[in-house]
């Protein structure tokens, strides 16, 4: 396994002979160090000969701006990899929680990708997402809602998101998931081929196995969560290798 390296604001894992590319955006503050938070998932994908680019960011209120920043960082990173490989890899975009929203708001509307995997799509208001915001924000005179807000986000997806191939994954015990809202918006588009998959787990399942392994070591691993991560790696890996639609 190659080592993580920093490129263009992203954490990158490049197998010796990459056969595909994963462009990953994590959720909320987990995405500050995705190479740690999502270690098990991302390294599992790299083991399938998929290059992994994970954008590192601190979440803010302007999600439209951050969607553009993430898209630009991942595009720049992809250019470095393609020059190195002397071939063009078309990515599968993978998002977790807020990361799904940022991918869906990308300036190219998903056109320059093979597919997208959306894990635990989350589209709550800022007040719902950030405890006490509604109480303290007025006194501080700060912005109290994400841009775009929840309803506008779904409208933009329905109107401007052009990628037909999407794998929307919901974890059964996830109290923050809004995948059904996403599926409804996607299904209203002409030619939509999105698929919905339910798995065991909760909102932190994509990240928790990596966190436990990184902080406590393999002895603290949770076999049930590891099995779910294995299923995620298989499903996303098949997308990345172009096997899902064969």
Regions found by a protein language model. Give the residues of each.
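Residue in the alpha/beta-hydrolase core beta-strand immediately N-terminal to the catalytic nucleophile
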Residues: 91-92, 115-117
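The feature captures the conserved acid-bearing segment of alpha/beta-hydrolase catalytic domains
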Residues: 13-16, 115, 125-195
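Catalytic histidine neighborhood in serine/cysteine hydrolases
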Residues: 189-215
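Catalytic active-site module of serine/aspartate enzymes centered on a nucleophile-bearing elbow/loop
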Residues: 208-246
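Alpha/beta-hydrolase active-site loop
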Residues: 61-88
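Short glycine-enriched nucleophile-adjacent loop
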Residues: 100-111, 116
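Gly/Ala-rich beta-loop-alpha elbow adjacent to hydrolase catalytic centers
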Residues: 91-103
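Short, surface-exposed "cap/lid" segments of acyl-processing enzymes
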Residues: 3-59
């Amino acid at each position: 396994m190659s080592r993580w390296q920093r490129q263009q604001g992203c954490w990158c894992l490049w197998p010796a002979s990459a056969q595909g590319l994963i462009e990953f955006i994590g959720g909320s503050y987990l995405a500050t160090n995705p190479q740690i938070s999502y270690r098990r998932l991302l390294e599992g994908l790299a083991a399938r000969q998929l290059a992994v680019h994970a954008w590192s960011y601190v979440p803010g209120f302007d999600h439209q701006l951050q969607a553009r920043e993430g898209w630009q960082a991942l595009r720049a990173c992809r250019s470095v990899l393609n020059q190195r490989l002397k071939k063009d890899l078309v990515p599968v975009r993978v998002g977790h929680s807020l990361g799904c929203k940022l991918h869906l708001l990308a300036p190219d509307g998903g056109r320059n990708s093979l597919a997208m995997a959306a894990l635990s799509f989350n589209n709550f208001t800022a007040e719902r997402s950030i405890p006490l915001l509604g109480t303290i924000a007025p006194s501080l005179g700060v912005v109290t809602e994400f841009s775009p807000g929840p309803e506008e986000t779904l409208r933009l997806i329905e109107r401007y998101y052009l990628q037909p191939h999407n794998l929307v994954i919901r974890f059964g015990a996830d109290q923050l998931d809004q995948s059904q809202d996403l599926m409804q918006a996607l299904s209203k588009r002409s030619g939509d081929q999105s698929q919905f998959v339910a798995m065991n787990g909760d909102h932190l399942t994509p990240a928790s196995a990596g966190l436990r392994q990184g902080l406590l070591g393999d002895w603290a691993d949770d076999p049930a969560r590891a099995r779910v991560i294995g299923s995620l790696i298989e499903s996303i890996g098949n997308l990345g290798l172009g096997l899902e639609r064969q």
